[in-house]
UniProtKB/Swiss-Prot annotation:
Protein name: Ribosomal protein L11 methyltransferase
Any one GO MF annotation of this record: protein-lysine N-methyltransferase activity
Function: Methylates ribosomal protein L11.
Top-level taxonomy: Bacteria, Pseudomonadati, Pseudomonadota, Gammaproteobacteria, Enterobacterales
Main localisation: cytoplasm
Gene Ontology biological process terms from the UniProt entry: methylation
Location in or out of the cell: Cytoplasm
């Protein structure tokens, strides 16, 4: 069915309040969009970080009288009479199909493919991870996930134990298992991530070799041959004492979620205990790898 879209421009600080106003005026969904395509850096715990200049977009049923909507919004103290906005009629499309059409199998390194469930597997002889795009957790499309997958693909993981610190969807742990690891351990602070990882592991037939823990439940003295953490630079620095003890002596460490401009400070946090490799960059992001001394 067709829809009507109303777009407001505001500051990040006011975006949530205007989102509520749009919903009260009859919007069926809300989208926040960066006005200037600038990156959002890591939020503080409990904080919803938005851009300084944010578009708030409300989607309305095609039968909605937008004059009434505008009249309601004009009563809001952040808007007032004659507030700037843009109303656009959206053409009737199969939005779910269009969304699905945007996702294709992706290759990482020499052996590894990440494939949505509705696509044909390009190479039956390759290492194929079946993973559908989701709203919250990694699916391989972000440069940091790509950097980690390429790194794992280049390792000999046969018989190894791998820890995925901040596992999200479980994509890195599952890829490691598919690439030959004997066991993987996923750790995440979000119970929804633990469930997503469990579901994806079952879908890929590796759930019997994947252990999943919230930090409070993880075993003491846990060790692995390979540790990968695709989180953010701030947590990587703060958690360096914890992450650094996870690899065995001579074990490998892979870190991402790091902007290139943050690489030096993250390297400094790990240099004492690891022999670090040259930093690898992709777009504005980078990967740091090393071996435990």
């Amino acid at each position: 069915m067709p829809w009507i879209q109303l777009k407001l421009n505001t500051t990040g600080a006011n975006a949530e309040e205007l989102s509520d106003a749009l919903m009260e005026a009859g919007a069926v969904s809300i989208t926040f969009q960066d006005t200037h395509d600038t990156p959002v850096f890591e939020p503080l715990p409990g904080e919803t970080r938005l851009w300084g200049d944010t578009d708030v977009i409300g989607l309305f049923d095609a039968e909605t009288d937008m004059k009434d909507v505008v009249a309601i919004l004009e009563q809001h103290p952040l808007l007032g009479a004659g507030f700037t906005h843009k109303i656009e009629q959206l053409e009737d499309k199969d939005w779910e199909r269009e969304w699905m059409d945007n996702f294709h199998p992706m290759r990482f390194g020499e052996r590894l493919w990440i494939c949505p469930s509705w696509r044909d597997i390009p190479d039956e002889n390759a290492v194929n991870v079946m993973l559908d795009p989701g709203l919250a957790f990694g699916t391989g499309t972000h440069p940091t996930t790509s950097l980690c997958l390429q790194w794992l693909d280049g390792l000999d993981l046969n018989g190894k134990t791998v820890i995925d610190f901040g596992c999200g969807s479980g994509i890195l742990a599952i890829a490691a298992l598919k690439l030959g690891a004997a066991k993987a351990i996923g750790i995440d602070i979000d119970p929804q991530a633990i469930q997503a990882s469990r579901d994806n592991a079952e879908r890929n037939g590796v759930s019997d070799r994947l252990e999943l823990y919230l930090p409070k439940d993880q075993p003491e003295a846990m060790k692995a041959d390979v540790v990968v953490a695709n989180i953010l630079a701030g947590p990587l620095r703060e958690l360096a004492p914890l992450i650094s003890v996870l690899p065995v002596e001579g074990g490998l460490l892979g870190l991402s979620g790091i902007l290139a401009s943050q690489a030096e400070s993250v390297c400094d946090a790990y240099a004492e205990l690891f022999t670090l490799d040259p930093v690898v960059e992709k777009e504005e992001w980078c990967r740091i790898t090393g071996r435990k001394k």
